Design a protein with these regions (language model features):
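Active-site neighborhood of HAD-like aspartate-dependent phosphohydrolases
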Residues: 1-49
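Substrate-recognition element of Asp-dependent hydrolases with the DxDx(T/V) motif
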Residues: 10, 40-69, 77-83, 122
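Short, acidic loop-to-helix structural element flanking the phosphoryl-transfer center
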Residues: 28-55, 86-91, 260-265, 269
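Substrate-recognition "cap/lid" segment bordering the active-site pocket of phosphatases
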Residues: 62-110, 116, 120, 315-317
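Acidic, Mg2+-coordinating phosphoryl-transfer loop and its flanking beta/alpha structural elements
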Residues: 112-159
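PRPP/pyrophosphate-binding module of the type I phosphoribosyltransferase fold
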Residues: 124-130, 135, 306-381
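Active-site-facing substrate-recognition patch
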Residues: 175-262, 302-330
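Basic, low-complexity terminal or inter-domain segments flanking catalytic cores
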Residues: 379-422
Length: 422
């Protein structure tokens, strides 16, 4: 496997602004002053022993990057890559015939890095990405997203790693280490999730977790927007629903392994009576296998009008849910802990409103689990007819992808050009 490794913040603990003059090539770096993350050299050596080819992929100046790559790690490097622009990386791939040949199968490649830029360039190359979390940022960098939590997560890395051992585990068995629902569609069982949010309330907490990515635009092949849209397909199969439920069950088995947290109820966000197909979430929920006590806690008002999907922003979505979706009365929730399952996490309006309703009922701990979460869009191809950016769309009926130059009829400003993706 070709393993592209970010340098600063991934192999070297040099994300701090003190290192900027060296990374920019203004000052010469003394290698004695380059702090390596514990185990970095051994990690690179282990990759090579196992037959992998590590290559440093860095935005920093070649004078800085090459010195570290050659004298500390003894591996090749690409510098001044201009992440997330993939052009220079593609030029490197295409200029090396053996690497170019491997690139025909994107499973031969992976990118490891600590910022959303590493994730985005990986998505543009359609290869898997590992977002590392090896240090706590001392300041926020707007461009790299260093010190921010939400943007790297919303960019949609394939994997997350807190140590080099985590990265090695991913490289050794990449399909097994996918998110729970992404893994199930590769015939693997995984209990992995995205830790999207955690809020502490004086010893009580609310946590949001997501089990698969809903891609928008370029991405690695393991993100499953096609499967999300399949939920709404009236012709969806029982096998498909069973796989979704199994992915949820696999994650809940992980939750059950923490006896310090006692969960009283497992519930779900029910569907409106007008939803098609009807009771889609209940059908999934009924197939989820867990030891938690299942219960229905939410229902929509009979007079609900409109659709949450058509609301333009977080505020409008939150107001819609607060008006029409209610926690059922008559069930004592005071001091209880509740797990809630929903199909999608986008703006977080549903998760936040439901969490607030449960807290108003006295609920102690809340675990909100979304089957899919919508990641940030990436557009990288221009329309051959009008030059505007093409969007990758998915046919809800069969899950096939296609490029679309969205016309005004569908909320865009393009010419309507369509191109199938093989």
């Amino acid at each position: 496997m070709i393993v592209f490794l970010d340098l600063d913040g991934t192999l070297t603990n040099t994300a701090h602004e003190w290192f900027k003059p060296f990374k920019d090539g203004i000052q010469e770096i003394d290698l004695n002053n380059v702090p390596l993350f514990n185990g970095a050299k051994q990690f690179v050596e282990d990759l090579q022993k196992e037959g992998h080819r590590p290559i440093i992929l860095s935005d920093s100046h070649p004078k800085y990057v090459n010195k570290i790559a050659q004298q500390i790690f003894q591996i090749p490097a690409i510098s001044l890559t201009d992440k997330p622009n993939a052009e220079k990386t593609l030029n490197y791939i295409n200029s090396n015939p053996d690497i170019q040949q491997l690139f025909s199968d994107k499973d031969n490649f992976i990118i490891v890095g600590d910022s959303w830029l590493d994730v985005e360039i990986g998505r543009r190359l359609n290869i898997r990405t590992v977002l590392t979390q090896f240090y706590k940022a001392s300041s926020i960098e707007e461009r790299d997203g260093i010190g921010q939590d939400w943007k790297p997560i919303k960019m949609g890395a394939t994997y997350y790693a807190k140590s080099f051992d985590d990265v090695k585990k991913i490289i050794q068995n990449p399909n097994k280490e996918l998110l729970a629902i992404e893994a199930i569609f590769q015939n693997e069982n995984s209990d992995n999730m995205v830790r999207f949010l955690y809020r502490n309330y004086n010893g009580e907490f609310t946590a949001f977790r997501c089990l698969a990515r809903q891609d928008d635009g370029e991405c690695d092949k393991f993100a499953r927007a096609d499967k999300y849209y399949q939920i709404d397909n009236p012709e969806r199969s029982h096998d498909f629903i069973s796989k979704l439920a199994q992915g949820v069950s696999n994650y809940l088995s992980r939750v059950e392994k923490f006896p310090q947290y006692q969960w009283d109820y497992l519930t779900y966000v029910s569907d409106k009576k007008t939803t098609s197909p009807p009771n889609k979430m209940k059908e999934i929920f009924d197939l989820v296998n867990s030891n938690f006590n299942k219960i229905k806690l939410f229902e929509w008002s009979e007079d609900v009008e409109g659709s949450l999907r058509n609301k333009p922003n977080y505020k409008a979505r939150r107001e819609f849910i607060a008006k029409y979706l209610k926690t059922i009365d008559g069930i004592d929730l005071n001091g209880k802990s509740v797990i809630v399952i929903d199909d999608q996490f986008t703006s977080s309006a549903t998760a936040n409103e439901i969490s607030q309703q449960l807290r108003n009922k006295g609920v102690k701990n809340i675990l909100f689990v979304a089957l899919f979460y919508l990641i940030l869009p990436i557009e990288s191809k221009a329309c051959p007819q009008c030059g505007k950016s093409l969007k990758i769309k998915i046919k809800r009926k069969d899950g096939n992808r296609f490029y679309s130059c969205l016309s005004p009829q569908f909320g865009g400003q393009g010419c309507g050009y369509i191109e199938n993706i093989n």
